[in-house]
């Protein structure tokens, strides 16, 4: 009975978001707008592109953070981190490499056809490229489902034969959804077809409005896999540190997921990683640009404090 009620409610919520041709041309869904980071003639978001032949000094002293966005988002989600670091001379030795997840950043057909394994491929590709170039200090910063992708790699032994990353920063890791309708959506996916999430006109250029049921199935599979890995427990590579920050009032990722991370993802010596809940109502609280919600001074202060904490730890 409860499941039936959930499916009825889901059906009421999941309808295709339609608009005229002019509107769709201004959406990421429509195929006319791509993630800028996919075109190196516009901007070189990957450090492997912007500094393809690092000097000996850069290989030894530059700290590269590979920034990984979340499900249905784009590289824009991490744009404020390098912008902030660029204003602070003390962080001049940090560079941010913003990847675009596989299947993301182009039209809706690419998004619909990609698996979660496809989503994650650019993460390790950039890591391997930077390592081969000789960069010695590489870390990760991930948001939401990007955290789940990285935790899947970590738990699967992907770094057993690779140099260990120095830091793993997880912002609002998506392990348990706050919206318990997700499981019902997956069950009813063939009937319902789509889960639209329309934002402001500017947000729609950087986030998919329509979220096809195929992509929700992939997201659900990824979260279940990572949840199971955390319940079983796994350890980070030797030398890798982790910092996890989770919003207390997140409408997308259940804060209980932070407890799973705390219990299940341990350092190489089996000690706990640094996990803290922060007082925020925002999902992906380090992204403030283009928000439709009214932002407060506390939101800005939390973003800056988190950026500084990440940068200070990387440079230690």
What do these predicted regions represent?
Residues 152-166:
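Conserved hydrolase catalytic core segment
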Residues 169-180:
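Active-site nucleophile loop of the alpha/beta-hydrolase fold
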Residues 106-137:
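Catalytic nucleophile-loop/oxyanion-hole region of alpha/beta-hydrolase
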Residues 51-59, 210-282, 302-308:
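Serine-hydrolase catalytic core
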Residues 141-146, 150:
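Gly/Ala-rich beta-loop-alpha elbow adjacent to hydrolase catalytic centers
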Residues 38-102:
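Short, surface-exposed "cap/lid" segments of acyl-processing enzymes
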């Amino acid at each position: 009975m409860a499941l039936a009620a959930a499916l009825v409610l889901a059906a009421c919520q999941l309808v295709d978001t339609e608009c005229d041709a002019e509107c769709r041309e201004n959406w990421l869904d429509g195929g006319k707008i791509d993630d800028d980071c996919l075109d190196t003639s516009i901007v070189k978001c990957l450090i492997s592109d912007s500094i393809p032949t690092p000097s000996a000094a850069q290989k030894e002293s530059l700290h590269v953070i590979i920034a990984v966005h979340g499900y249905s988002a784009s590289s824009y989600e991490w744009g404020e981190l390098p912008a902030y670091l660029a204003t602070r001379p003390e962080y001049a030795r940090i560079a941010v490499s913003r990847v675009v997840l596989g299947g993301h950043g182009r039209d809706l057909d690419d998004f619909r056809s990609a698996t979660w394994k496809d989503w994650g491929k650019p993460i390790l590709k950039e890591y391997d490229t930077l390592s081969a170039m000789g960069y010695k200090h590489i870390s990760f910063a991930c948001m939401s489902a990007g955290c789940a992708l990285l935790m899947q790699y970590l738990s699967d032994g992907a770094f057993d034969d690779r140099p260990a990353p120095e830091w793993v920063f997880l912002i609002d890791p998506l392990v348990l959804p706050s919206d318990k309708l997700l499981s019902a959506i997956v069950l009813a996916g063939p009937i319902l077809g789509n889960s639209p999430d329309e934002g402001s006109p500017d947000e729609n250029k950087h986030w998919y409005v329509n979220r096809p049921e195929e992509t929700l199935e992939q997201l659900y599979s990824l979260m279940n896999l990572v949840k199971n890995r955390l319940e079983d427990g796994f350890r980070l590579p030797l030398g890798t540190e982790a910092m996890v920050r989770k919003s207390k009032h997140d409408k997308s990722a259940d804060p209980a997921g932070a407890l799973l991370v705390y219990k299940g993802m341990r350092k190489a010596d089996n000690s706990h990683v640094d996990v803290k809940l922060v007082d925020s109502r925002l999902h992906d609280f380090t992204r403030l640009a283009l928000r439709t919600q009214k932002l407060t001074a506390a939101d800005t202060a939390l973003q800056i404090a988190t950026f500084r904490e990440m940068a200070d730890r990387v440079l230690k």
